[in-house]
Amino acid sequence: MIRAIVTDIEGTTSDIRFVHNVLFPYARERLAGFVTAQQFVEPVKTILDNLREEIAQPAAGAEELIATLFAFMDEDRKSTALKALQGIIWRDGYVHGDFTGHLYPDVLPALEKWKSQGIDLYVYSSGSVAAQKLLFGYSDEGDITHLFNGYFDTLVGAKREAQSYRNIAEQLGQPPAAILFLSDIHQELDAAEEAGFRTLQLVRGDRDPASHHPQVQRFDDIHPEQIPA
């Protein structure tokens, strides 16, 4: 029996184009000015210190760090420091109504149904926990954060490494076979499966011929009660 569902965001609950065409450009446009203005103010000061440690350059100044952050964005590097800074910038955008977090229309009814069935719901995304809470707190459907029991980001590990999912299962206090992981990326599902999770792949477009995981197009095609644990 599935007792917990862990869902990805990009391409799963939300259109990846929202992240790449709205969120990323919004943060990129404001990053340099934000870091320059906030570099000595918490929490940005600590985030930049962590970035210096990440790149092994303890004496790096603001200009150098900004150049590094732009390079990370160009590479789509899953840097915890970059994700934290983006999250702070995005918060202003959400709060000021510059955008709302995209949700596919089939997502909320399914989440509410699973919650009513006693299934615990979690999020696991490469975006920071703060950014995840913003997307669901200021979503197209309003604030739906009350539906989730918890959130995980890269602090628990990389999404293509099986140990990350073992860490999640340990934190949830559930046997891996009682946890269903939803993602649009088969390599992430491979890692979750290696850790003992049940898996389902969301394919919002064409099917993924390289994947051996069960594939569905919508959240209302998912029936946790029919998945053996």
From Swiss-Prot:
Record's cofactor remark: Binds 1 Mg(2+) ion per subunit.
Q: What would you give as a GO molecular function for this chain, any one?
A: 2,3-diketo-5-methylthiopentyl-1-phosphate enolase activity
Write down the chemical reaction(s) this protein catalyses.
Answer: 5-methylsulfanyl-2,3-dioxopentyl phosphate + H2O = 1,2-dihydroxy-5-(methylsulfanyl)pent-1-en-3-one + phosphate
What keywords appear on the UniProt entry?
Answer: Amino-acid biosynthesis, Hydrolase, Magnesium, Metal-binding, Methionine biosynthesis
List compositional bias (Basic and acidic residues) regions by residue number: 218-229
GO biological-process terms attached to the record: L-methionine salvage from methylthioadenosine
The organism's superkingdom is given as Bacteria
Q: What family is reported?
A: Belongs to the HAD-like hydrolase superfamily. MasA/MtnC family.
Kindly state the subunit structure of this protein: Monomer.
Q: What is this protein called?
A: Enolase-phosphatase E1
UniProt lists the gene as: mtnC
